Each structure stands twice: as C-alpha cells, then as structure tokens.
Amino acid sequence: MTEAQKSLKRTLIGKVVSDKRQKTVTVLVERRVKHELYGKIIARSSKYHAHDEKGEYKLGDMIEITESRPLSKTKNWVASRLVQKAGLL
C-alpha cells in the first residue's frame, strides 16, 4: 500500500450524546440533504460509537471522529480531537 492510500480515512464531526460506557462515547453526526422530489432541506442524523481511550470527552462536546479498524461489534471509529467544549447550562 502506498502512503496516499493509508491516509484515506473518513473523518466526521459530531456531538457526544452519551459517555456512560468506559472508553466509548456515542456521537451524533447531523447532515443536511435536499429532498429528491420536493427540494426541501432535511436534517438527517446518524449515531456512531467511538473509542475514547482516556475518557476525556464529555456529554455535549463537539468532537472529530476518525474511521479505524473494527474495535468491537459496533465500534469502528476513534475519537481524534476536541472541536468545541460543551457549554455551561
């Protein structure tokens, strides 16, 4: 494999919606798509389980996740960096 092929990992930015499990966070990634027939912009979302080795990301944080090898049955992503800290309520 060449160096260019190794770096083709997808990255997504989303909000942490659950941090209850050890070393795992659930991230909600929202995207906007145009309805095929009516043309209205619709919000679609997906949840991903991401590996958080140090447990540093908390509920409400915006983080970037990177695709990786399968780490468990449902975990194929790794939390790579903090984009924005959760605001105080």
Curated annotation (Swiss-Prot):
CDD domains: Ribosomal_uS17 (cd00364)
A Gene Ontology term for the protein's cellular component: cytosolic small ribosomal subunit
UniProt xrefs under InterPro entries: NA-bd_OB-fold, Ribosomal_uS17, Ribosomal_uS17_bact/chlr, Ribosomal_uS17_CS
PROSITE patterns per UniProt: RIBOSOMAL_S17
Any Gene Ontology biological process: translation
One Gene Ontology molecular-function label: structural constituent of ribosome
Keywords in alphabetical order: Ribonucleoprotein, Ribosomal protein, RNA-binding, rRNA-binding
UniProt entry tagged with the keyword Isomerase: no
Function: One of the primary rRNA binding proteins, it binds specifically to the 5'-end of 16S ribosomal RNA.
Family per record: Belongs to the universal ribosomal protein uS17 family.
Complexes and interactors: Part of the 30S ribosomal subunit.
PANTHER family (alphabetical): 40S RIBOSOMAL PROTEIN S11 FAMILY MEMBER, SMALL RIBOSOMAL SUBUNIT PROTEIN US17M
Protein name, entry field: Small ribosomal subunit protein uS17
Lineage of origin: Bacteria, Pseudomonadati, Pseudomonadota, Betaproteobacteria, Burkholderiales
Gene name linked to the record: rpsQ
